[in-house]
Regions:
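Transmembrane alpha-helices
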Residues: 1-58
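Aromatic-anchored segments of alpha-helical transmembrane domains
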Residues: 13-24, 75-80, 162-173
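N-terminal signal-anchor transmembrane alpha helix
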Residues: 63-90
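Interfacial helix-loop-helix junctions of multi-pass membrane proteins
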Residues: 84, 88-92, 171-193
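Membrane-interface interhelical connector segments
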Residues: 88-121
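Individual transmembrane alpha-helix segments
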Residues: 116-135
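Internal alpha-helical transmembrane segments of multi-pass membrane proteins
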Residues: 137, 141, 147-167, 215
Length: 215
Protein backbone atom coordinates (compact mmCIF):
# COMPACT_ATOMS: atom_id res chain seq x y z
CA UNK A 1 0.00 0.00 0.00
CA UNK A 2 1.07 3.58 -0.54
CA UNK A 3 2.23 5.48 2.57
CA UNK A 4 -0.91 7.63 2.80
CA UNK A 5 -3.14 4.57 2.39
CA UNK A 6 -1.25 2.77 5.16
CA UNK A 7 -1.68 5.74 7.49
CA UNK A 8 -5.37 5.96 6.61
CA UNK A 9 -5.91 2.24 7.29
CA UNK A 10 -3.98 2.43 10.56
CA UNK A 11 -6.01 5.41 11.79
CA UNK A 12 -9.34 3.87 10.80
CA UNK A 13 -8.47 0.68 12.69
CA UNK A 14 -7.24 2.64 15.71
CA UNK A 15 -10.72 4.09 16.27
CA UNK A 16 -11.64 0.89 18.12
CA UNK A 17 -9.21 1.44 20.98
CA UNK A 18 -9.68 5.22 20.79
CA UNK A 19 -13.31 4.78 21.79
CA UNK A 20 -12.16 3.30 25.10
CA UNK A 21 -9.24 5.66 25.61
CA UNK A 22 -11.50 8.67 25.12
CA UNK A 23 -13.91 7.36 27.74
CA UNK A 24 -11.11 6.78 30.23
CA UNK A 25 -9.62 10.23 29.70
CA UNK A 26 -13.10 11.81 29.67
CA UNK A 27 -12.66 13.16 26.17
CA UNK A 28 -15.90 11.63 24.83
CA UNK A 29 -18.47 9.01 25.84
CA UNK A 30 -17.59 5.56 24.54
CA UNK A 31 -21.17 5.12 23.31
CA UNK A 32 -21.00 8.27 21.17
CA UNK A 33 -17.57 7.53 19.71
CA UNK A 34 -18.45 3.92 18.92
CA UNK A 35 -21.60 4.88 17.04
CA UNK A 36 -20.38 8.10 15.42
CA UNK A 37 -16.77 7.24 14.62
CA UNK A 38 -15.75 3.61 15.12
CA UNK A 39 -18.61 1.91 13.25
CA UNK A 40 -18.35 4.29 10.26
CA UNK A 41 -14.57 3.68 10.30
CA UNK A 42 -15.23 -0.07 10.07
CA UNK A 43 -17.47 0.60 7.09
CA UNK A 44 -14.73 2.67 5.48
CA UNK A 45 -12.19 -0.13 5.97
CA UNK A 46 -14.51 -2.66 4.38
CA UNK A 47 -15.25 -0.27 1.51
CA UNK A 48 -11.53 0.33 0.95
CA UNK A 49 -10.83 -3.41 0.90
CA UNK A 50 -13.65 -4.04 -1.59
CA UNK A 51 -12.62 -1.12 -3.79
CA UNK A 52 -9.05 -2.43 -3.83
CA UNK A 53 -10.30 -5.82 -4.97
CA UNK A 54 -12.70 -4.59 -7.64
CA UNK A 55 -10.94 -1.52 -9.00
CA UNK A 56 -7.29 -1.95 -8.06
CA UNK A 57 -4.72 -4.71 -7.73
CA UNK A 58 -6.35 -6.05 -4.57
CA UNK A 59 -3.22 -5.59 -2.45
CA UNK A 60 -4.78 -3.27 0.12
CA UNK A 61 -7.76 -5.56 0.48
CA UNK A 62 -5.56 -8.61 1.03
CA UNK A 63 -3.45 -6.81 3.63
CA UNK A 64 -6.53 -5.65 5.54
CA UNK A 65 -8.12 -9.11 5.38
CA UNK A 66 -4.99 -10.92 6.54
CA UNK A 67 -4.52 -8.49 9.41
CA UNK A 68 -8.16 -8.78 10.49
CA UNK A 69 -8.17 -12.58 10.48
CA UNK A 70 -4.82 -12.79 12.25
CA UNK A 71 -5.95 -10.29 14.88
CA UNK A 72 -9.08 -12.32 15.60
CA UNK A 73 -7.18 -15.61 15.85
CA UNK A 74 -4.60 -13.94 18.09
CA UNK A 75 -7.37 -12.63 20.37
CA UNK A 76 -8.74 -16.17 20.70
CA UNK A 77 -5.27 -17.52 21.57
CA UNK A 78 -4.83 -14.65 24.04
CA UNK A 79 -8.07 -15.55 25.82
CA UNK A 80 -7.37 -19.29 25.83
CA UNK A 81 -4.08 -18.61 27.60
CA UNK A 82 -5.93 -16.57 30.23
CA UNK A 83 -8.67 -19.13 30.92
CA UNK A 84 -6.80 -21.05 33.68
CA UNK A 85 -6.25 -17.79 35.56
CA UNK A 86 -9.89 -16.73 35.26
CA UNK A 87 -11.25 -20.13 36.30
CA UNK A 88 -8.44 -21.13 38.64
CA UNK A 89 -10.74 -21.80 41.61
CA UNK A 90 -13.60 -23.51 39.77
CA UNK A 91 -11.16 -25.73 37.88
CA UNK A 92 -9.33 -26.71 41.08
CA UNK A 93 -6.11 -24.99 40.02
CA UNK A 94 -5.89 -22.51 42.88
CA UNK A 95 -2.77 -24.17 44.27
CA UNK A 96 -0.99 -23.95 40.92
CA UNK A 97 -2.39 -20.95 39.09
CA UNK A 98 -3.25 -17.58 40.66
CA UNK A 99 -6.86 -16.48 40.31
CA UNK A 100 -7.19 -13.25 38.31
CA UNK A 101 -10.45 -11.56 37.18
CA UNK A 102 -9.15 -10.94 33.68
CA UNK A 103 -12.55 -11.08 31.96
CA UNK A 104 -14.45 -8.80 34.32
CA UNK A 105 -13.90 -5.71 32.17
CA UNK A 106 -15.82 -7.03 29.15
CA UNK A 107 -19.34 -6.48 30.54
CA UNK A 108 -18.22 -3.00 31.55
CA UNK A 109 -17.22 -2.31 27.95
CA UNK A 110 -20.71 -3.34 26.90
CA UNK A 111 -22.33 -1.15 29.53
CA UNK A 112 -20.34 1.86 28.34
CA UNK A 113 -21.22 1.27 24.69
CA UNK A 114 -24.92 0.68 25.36
CA UNK A 115 -25.13 3.44 27.96
CA UNK A 116 -26.49 1.13 30.64
CA UNK A 117 -25.67 0.93 34.33
CA UNK A 118 -26.40 -2.81 34.52
CA UNK A 119 -23.39 -4.81 33.37
CA UNK A 120 -25.02 -8.21 33.90
CA UNK A 121 -27.57 -8.30 31.07
CA UNK A 122 -26.97 -10.63 28.13
CA UNK A 123 -26.90 -7.75 25.65
CA UNK A 124 -24.26 -5.91 27.66
CA UNK A 125 -22.11 -9.02 27.98
CA UNK A 126 -22.34 -9.85 24.27
CA UNK A 127 -21.55 -6.29 23.20
CA UNK A 128 -18.63 -6.18 25.63
CA UNK A 129 -17.14 -9.37 24.23
CA UNK A 130 -17.76 -8.16 20.67
CA UNK A 131 -15.84 -4.98 21.48
CA UNK A 132 -13.01 -7.04 22.96
CA UNK A 133 -12.68 -9.01 19.72
CA UNK A 134 -13.01 -5.83 17.66
CA UNK A 135 -9.87 -4.63 19.40
CA UNK A 136 -8.09 -7.84 18.45
CA UNK A 137 -9.21 -7.54 14.83
CA UNK A 138 -8.29 -3.87 14.53
CA UNK A 139 -4.93 -4.39 16.22
CA UNK A 140 -4.31 -6.95 13.49
CA UNK A 141 -5.21 -4.41 10.81
CA UNK A 142 -2.98 -1.79 12.45
CA UNK A 143 -0.09 -4.27 12.45
CA UNK A 144 -0.81 -5.14 8.82
CA UNK A 145 -0.65 -1.48 7.87
CA UNK A 146 2.66 -1.10 9.69
CA UNK A 147 4.42 -4.00 7.98
CA UNK A 148 2.64 -3.46 4.64
CA UNK A 149 2.47 -7.11 3.69
CA UNK A 150 6.09 -7.93 4.56
CA UNK A 151 4.86 -10.68 6.86
CA UNK A 152 7.96 -12.88 7.02
CA UNK A 153 10.58 -10.19 7.16
CA UNK A 154 8.86 -8.03 9.75
CA UNK A 155 6.81 -10.46 11.83
CA UNK A 156 8.72 -9.67 15.09
CA UNK A 157 7.06 -6.24 14.85
CA UNK A 158 3.86 -8.03 15.91
CA UNK A 159 5.45 -8.97 19.24
CA UNK A 160 6.81 -5.48 19.89
CA UNK A 161 3.45 -3.98 18.96
CA UNK A 162 1.41 -6.34 21.16
CA UNK A 163 3.63 -6.07 24.24
CA UNK A 164 3.96 -2.33 23.72
CA UNK A 165 0.17 -1.98 23.75
CA UNK A 166 -0.06 -3.68 27.14
CA UNK A 167 2.78 -1.65 28.63
CA UNK A 168 1.14 1.53 27.39
CA UNK A 169 -2.24 0.56 28.85
CA UNK A 170 -0.67 0.07 32.28
CA UNK A 171 0.19 3.77 32.28
CA UNK A 172 -3.34 4.87 31.33
CA UNK A 173 -6.30 5.19 33.73
CA UNK A 174 -7.38 1.67 32.61
CA UNK A 175 -6.54 -0.12 35.90
CA UNK A 176 -8.17 2.58 38.04
CA UNK A 177 -11.29 2.89 35.87
CA UNK A 178 -11.98 -0.84 35.99
CA UNK A 179 -10.82 -1.47 39.54
CA UNK A 180 -7.84 -3.63 38.59
CA UNK A 181 -5.08 -4.22 41.13
CA UNK A 182 -1.79 -3.95 39.26
CA UNK A 183 0.23 -6.60 41.09
CA UNK A 184 3.44 -8.23 39.90
CA UNK A 185 1.44 -11.36 39.07
CA UNK A 186 -1.06 -9.38 37.01
CA UNK A 187 1.69 -7.65 35.04
CA UNK A 188 3.55 -10.90 34.31
CA UNK A 189 0.40 -12.74 33.21
CA UNK A 190 -0.89 -9.92 31.01
CA UNK A 191 2.50 -9.38 29.39
CA UNK A 192 2.76 -13.12 28.70
CA UNK A 193 -0.74 -13.06 27.21
CA UNK A 194 0.17 -10.16 24.94
CA UNK A 195 3.36 -11.94 23.94
CA UNK A 196 1.21 -14.87 22.84
CA UNK A 197 -1.10 -12.46 21.03
CA UNK A 198 1.84 -10.96 19.14
CA UNK A 199 3.46 -14.27 18.21
CA UNK A 200 0.14 -15.71 17.06
CA UNK A 201 -0.73 -12.63 15.04
CA UNK A 202 2.64 -12.53 13.31
CA UNK A 203 2.72 -16.23 12.47
CA UNK A 204 -0.91 -16.41 11.33
CA UNK A 205 -0.25 -13.55 8.89
CA UNK A 206 2.59 -15.58 7.40
CA UNK A 207 0.37 -18.65 7.16
CA UNK A 208 -2.43 -16.72 5.48
CA UNK A 209 -0.22 -15.01 2.92
CA UNK A 210 -0.48 -17.61 0.16
CA UNK A 211 -4.09 -18.59 0.82
CA UNK A 212 -5.46 -15.05 0.73
CA UNK A 213 -3.36 -14.24 -2.34
CA UNK A 214 -5.43 -16.80 -4.26
CA UNK A 215 -8.75 -15.21 -3.28
Amino acid sequence: MKPLTRIFVFLLAATSIWSLLGEMYRLWPMRFFTLAVFLPACGALIALALYSRWRGDGRAGRIILIGAIAGFVAAVAYDIFRLPFVFSKSWGLAGLVPSLPLFKVFPQFGAMILGKADSNSLAVILVGWAYHFSNGITFGVMYAAMVNGQWRRRWPVAIVFAVGLELAMLFTPYPAVFGIRVTDTFVVVTLAAHLIFGVTMGRVCIGLEKGVAKC
